[in-house]
């Protein structure tokens, strides 16, 4: 009887910089149906209190079927779909552009995401490079709900892999008004400031005006870790403390999208 063990390597280590190709289309795995539990946990982790996402009665008075899922929670979940293919081996996420919220997301909706590689640039040290992708998330009816561009620095695995042609996409400085989506059913005539707790409306604000919000929030690793798991974002730099101690950062990095959520909540 042989004691030989037949071991095969079926573990996916994710994509490294040299694995990406210009115009490559990636259909990301694990569609996600969003439920009440995600919404409740998101509030617990961020303190978000936007009334449209809190009260069915308010949302319905404005023309919605029910309260929509918080835009940023839905975005983080859609974004999380891209991580295993795009940025599980990231050095750091570098930026976002052309982010558009195209359709409300409701409890029970299922989100799926795909990405197209639109740019590549290897860094001068030859150890990493920047990948530009345009991602689109759709619901179960194939309606686009989000679209965005991001660029992320990704490690190389094979240092001898050939350098790809540098292609840096031309991106908009901001999303023009003509590209912003306002729901056709929106009816603001029944909007009531008593529901928001604030008295100021759109025409009360001025360009250049600065508002110093009184609240603050101390960020800790446990909250960040739980939130990033909620979004199913499995990038190693957010979780692997042993690995990150060997980098110039010296510690885990927080998912920047969660910081955006905390700032919005404050």
Residue spans for each PLM region:
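Flexible glycine-rich active-site/ligand-binding loops centered on an Asp-His dyad
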Residues: 134-137, 143, 148-163
């Amino acid at each position: 009887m042989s004691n030989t063990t037949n071991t095969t390597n079926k573990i996916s280590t994710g994509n490294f910089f040299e694995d990406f190709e210009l115009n490559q289309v990636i259909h990301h795995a694990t569609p996600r149906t969003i439920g009440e539990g995600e919404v409740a946990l998101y509030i617990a982790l961020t303190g978000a209190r936007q009334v449209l996402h809190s009260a069915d009665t308010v949302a319905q008075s404005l023309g919605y079927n029910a309260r929509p899922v918080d835009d940023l929670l839905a975005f983080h979940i859609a974004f999380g779909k891209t991580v295993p293919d795009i940025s599980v081996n990231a050095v750091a996420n570098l930026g976002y552009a052309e982010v558009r919220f195209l359709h409300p997301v409701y409890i029970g909706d299922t989100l799926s995401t795909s990405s197209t590689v639109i740019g590549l640039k290897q860094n001068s040290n030859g150890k990493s490079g920047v990948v530009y992708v345009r991602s689109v998330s759709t619901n179960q009816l194939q309606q686009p709900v989000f679209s965005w561009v991001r660029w992320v620095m990704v490690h190389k695995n094979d240092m001898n892999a050939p350098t790809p042609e540098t292609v840096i996409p031309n991106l908009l400085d901001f999303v023009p008004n003509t590209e912003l989506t306002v729901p056709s059913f929106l009816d603001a005539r029944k909007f009531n400031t008593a529901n928001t707790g604030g008295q100021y409306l759109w025409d009360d604000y001025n360009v250049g005006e600065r508002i110093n919000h009184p609240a603050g929030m101390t960020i800790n690793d446990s909250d960040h870790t739980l939130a990033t798991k909620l979004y199913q974002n499995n990038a190693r730099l957010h979780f692997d403390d042993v690995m990150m101690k060997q980098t110039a950062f010296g510690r885990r990095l927080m998912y920047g999208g969660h910081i955006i959520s905390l700032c919005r909540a404050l």
